Amino acid sequence: MQGQAQQQAYDRGITIFSPDGRLYQVEYAREAVKRGTASVGIRTPDGIVLAADKRSRSPLMEPTSVEKIHKTDDHVGIASAGHVADARQLIDFARRQAQVNRLRYGEPVGIETLTKNVTDNIQQYTQVGGARPFGVALLIGGIEDGSPRLYETDPSGTPYEWKAVSIGADRSDLQEHLEENYTEELSLDEGVGLALRTIAISNDDELTAAGVDVATVASDTEEFIELTNDEISAYIADNDLEPAEETDSE
């Protein structure tokens, strides 16, 4: 009973390490990320690709009300997995940081600088009493000094830079697919195709344009662009991800 009581104390105390050096609330926040639908980020020489599974919970839900990818500044976007409300708070914070940088220095914020500002904010919520960690992971992708940069944040407040990465549900399967198929010579179009094929692994239903968000940031224009449903449908068709047509059996 005493051991169980000690376990509960470490569970409830966000700022208390367990005897084996664990912060249980941060670990639980990571579990919340795993319950979210998948998002994928891919870095290519031509730019950044962000894709996110945004399947709605009901056919009555308006698909446009589900947002998984957000424009943060002209040259950077963020995809999320986990608690949507937590993601919204962090994305609003990131947007404010980007605006402050433009007002103060007259130039776009660096992707690495923006990521570290966001992760510093996340990390504070692992040390402050009366709060809880953010139950969300983010992919922050954009162009910095003409070069594509792609970062992941997790609930501990740790930033990681990647060439290709997935967050959310079925991460191990999606990451394995990326490791097997990613090359550093991918074009931006090929990156979109790889991102959609990766998302399809986590999607039990057929992949549709209404069920996925895709955005790119090209190196030459440094412009964040969200793909339209028609453009996504064309990529789905080009990558043989369309639902198979049913044939009548005699």
Curated annotation (Swiss-Prot):
Cytoplasm recorded as keyword: yes
Keywords per UniProt: Cytoplasm, Proteasome
Gene3D superfamilies referenced in this protein's UniProt entry, alphabetically: Glutamine Phosphoribosylpyrophosphate, subunit 1, domain 1
CDD domains: proteasome_alpha_archeal
Top-level division of the source organism's lineage: Archaea
Function: Component of the proteasome core, a large protease complex with broad specificity involved in protein degradation.
Family that this chain belongs to: Belongs to the peptidase T1A family.
Protein name: Proteasome subunit alpha
Gene that this polypeptide is encoded by: psmA
